[in-house]
Amino acid sequence: MPRPFDPMDVLCLPLMANLATIGADGPRNAPVWFIWEEEALWMLGSETSRSVARLLADPACAVEIVHFDNAAGILLHLGFRGRASVEPMDAPRFRRLLARYLGPDESAWNPWFIKEIAAIDDPGGRWIRLVPVSTFTNNVSYFRSGPALAWPR
């Protein structure tokens, strides 16, 4: 029995999103960092990434984000469906995304990671943008406390 919740309760957390796409050889799933801005989910990609290539061929996709805290008994499931677009990199948005996951103090970010992996100013960087056509939420935070919900407290 679905128990809805406000999607922002999950979207505001630095969690991993799972991006599901379809290719010629079947479905694929990729864990991605994300940021919610302008009523859209923005996920990292690059011009050479397979997720970007699959979405350019078929933009239909699904995204699942789960907030799970076993000890606290929290299990929140957020799902989006829709058609994604591939957008050019926007360095200020990328910095905001990095601040979500690495903290607001850029001087504390791992310089090797920023240069070699994040490559903020790389012209090959892309955003995968999903404006959800459908949204599903389910608060299953009763597996330890049921039938009462462990969240919200």
Q: Could you describe each region identified by the protein language model?
A:
Residues 1-17, 149:
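Extreme N-terminal tail/first-helix region
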Residues 7-8, 52, 118:
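Short amphipathic alpha-helical segments and helix-helix/interface helices
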Residues 28, 48-51, 122-124:
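A short beta-loop-beta micro-motif enriched in histidine and acidic residues
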Residues 46-50, 101-102:
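Short, solvent-exposed aromatic-acidic interface loops
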Residues 47-48, 62-67, 107-116:
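Short acidic (Asp/Glu) patches
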Residues 51-58, 62-88:
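Helix-adjacent hinge/juxtasegments
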Residues 75-153:
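Charged, gly/pro-rich active-site loop segments
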